Amino acid sequence: TLLASSAASDVYKRQSLYCGIDPTGDSMHIGHLIPFMILKRFQLAGHHPVILIGGGTGAIGDPSGRTTERVLQTADQVKHNADSLTEQMKKLFGEDGSFTMMNNYDWLSKISLLDFLRDYGKLFNINTMLAKDVVASRLETGISFTEFSYQILQSIDYKMLYEKCGVQLQIGGADQGGNITNGIELIRKTNENHEAFGLTIPLMLKADGTKF
C-alpha cells in the first residue's frame, strides 16, 4: 500500500492537493459538498489545498454523468460564474494564504491547436480514451470532439499544478476516476521522477440516481 511503502516523514509532511470546479453555474451546489469538505479537512490538518476554477474547461463542458451534449456558455457567462465561485471559495477556505486559487484558463487559453496536438495529443491513446466510462456510455448517442477532448484538458491541469505548485494529489468524484488517472499517466510520461496520486469519493446523487 501507499502508506506501507512510505517513510514516516513522507506520511506526515505537508502536502499540496487540489480539487477543481467548472463554472457551469454562479454558485456551488450540494453535489460539491463532499469533495470540498474533504479538501477543507486537509487544510485544517495543515496541508495546502489548491482550488482550480475551470475557466478553460468550463468553456468546453465536462461530459461526465451526462447523456446529451452540454449547451456552451458565452465567455461572459463563464467569467461571471468563475468570479462568483472564487468569492465563495474565499469564504469557505479563508484569505490567510493557507490555500491557493487558480484558473485553468490562464494556461489552457495559451495552448495553440498545433501545440495541443503535438505536445499532448501524441501522449494519449484513443483506444484507452474510448474505454473510459464517460465516453463509452455516450458512443451510441454521440459525443462531440469538443467533449471527447475534455479529459485531455483536465490531464493538462494536473500536469501544470504538479510542475508549478508541487501538487501530488487530485481529489474528485467517483465519476472523475478516468480523468484523474489520465492526468497521473500524463505526469508519468512527462516527468522522470513522478509521484502523483488520485483520490475519488462517492457522489452525492439526487433521489433518481442522477448528479446534481
What is each stretch, according to the model?
Residues P63-K79:
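A charged helix-plus-loop insertion that forms the helical arch/lid used to bind
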Residues T1-Y12:
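Single conserved hydrophobic/aromatic residue that forms the stacking wall/gate
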Residues K211-F212:
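A conserved active-site cap/scaffold subdomain adjacent to cofactor or substrate pockets
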Residues I60-G65, S112-L114:
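Short, conserved acidic/polar surface loops in the N-terminal third of protein domains
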Residues K13-P63, Q170-G177:
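N-terminal catalytic cores of NTP/NDP-binding nucleotidyl/phosphoryl-transfer enzymes
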Residues T74-A75, N81-A82, T86, K90-D208:
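Divalent-metal (Mg2+/Mn2+/Ca2+)-assisted nucleotide/phosphate chemistry catalytic cores
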Residues A8, A45-H48, H194:
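Short glycine-/polar-rich loops that comprise or flank the Walker A/P-loop
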